[in-house]
């Protein structure tokens, strides 16, 4: 997992490229949590990704924001999909968000209970039937199947 910060510090594009490349060579899936603004590091990650996943809450404001950014992202990397997190306060459905944004719906999920608390106090421990784990499995299933990882017969991939 590679993530930046919201506090003005920008990741270096070379560092992002090195992490993604090392992950691929090591045979692991690399997940990059990208900011909303396009930076050199963001561009590097988007260029390298086998799949770009936009995660959106299921509400009108988020739908509008997703609809705005989707065409920009698709010019950088056409392998784009959507995960919608609900529930919707007004009855909007995940499929409607995907249709409006013009993106394929990879997964929809309800909010993961106690997610922030788990992350702040020792890390994420998901049960296999949790909303986040189920959505993650659906997204990972979209990625191309692994080829040959050094020592294990599988290859790495960036997401």
Residue ranges and their predicted role:
Residues 27, 36-60:
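Inter-motif core of Ras-like GTPase G domains
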Residues 66:
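An amphipathic, basic-hydrophobic helix/alpha-beta surface used to engage anionic
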């Amino acid at each position: 997992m590679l993530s930046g910060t919201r506090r003005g510090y920008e990741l270096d594009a070379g560092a992002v490229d090195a992490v993604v490349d090392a992950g691929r060579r090591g045979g692991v899936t690399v997940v990059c949590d990208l900011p909303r603004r396009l930076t050199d590091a963001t561009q590097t990650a988007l260029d390298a990704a086998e799949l770009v996943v936009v995660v959106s809450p299921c509400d009108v404001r988020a739908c509008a924001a997703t609809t705005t950014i989707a065409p920009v992202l698709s010019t950088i990397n056409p392998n784009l999909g959507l995960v919608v997190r609900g529930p919707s306060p007004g009855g909007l459905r995940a499929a409607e968000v995907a249709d409006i944004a013009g993106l394929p719906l990879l997964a929809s999920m309800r909010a993961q209970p106690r997610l922030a608390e788990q992350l702040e106090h020792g890390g994420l421990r998901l049960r296999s039937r949790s909303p986040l784990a189920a959505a993650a499995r659906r997204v990972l299933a979209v990625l191309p199947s692994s080829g040959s990882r050094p020592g294990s017969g599988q290859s790495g991939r960036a997401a």
